[in-house]
Amino acid sequence: RVDNGTMRWYDVDLPAAMELRRSYYEDTERFHSIARSVLEFDWMNQLPDDPGERFLFVAEGLFPYLPEDGPRDLVIGLLRRFPGAELVAEFASQDVVRLMSGRFGRGKLRRRFGLSDDVWFRSGLSDPREPEEWAEGIMLLDEWCYFDESDPRIDWMRPFTRLESIGRPLFVARFRLG
């Protein structure tokens, strides 16, 4: 995270994850940690309620783990509470969600990252424009996939992305909310 010397950063995560983070860094005047589920919208009350305030929300490694309707509910909640904000979020395709929510995917998450059996991919998108259908005022501004540019570490996988069933497995999308 890059600090420009003026911005305020609010980090929202589950209490157990926040406790671990606090062992590495503390809150400051401009950095605030909020130990809540993003789906418990009362965390939004801790952010400034100034009509001139501009917000950028970043959801990295979050949406695939939320319940199926979680991303939609959160985006609509942000739209209603912070009109004019932007959201940059990482999404998984429906095919990746099916793969990672099965026995193989759960086992991989458990072995590789030490996650418990109740943590797995639960939600994905078929198309980056899908959130525009959730509510009026959600507008896709940009989207990109990890495979859009050449990188020697993952180039061997690029031919597979031409298969319709794989396509864009993980992608990032930027939206204007309202």
Stretches found by the model and what they are:
Residues 1-178:
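Alpha-helical subdomain
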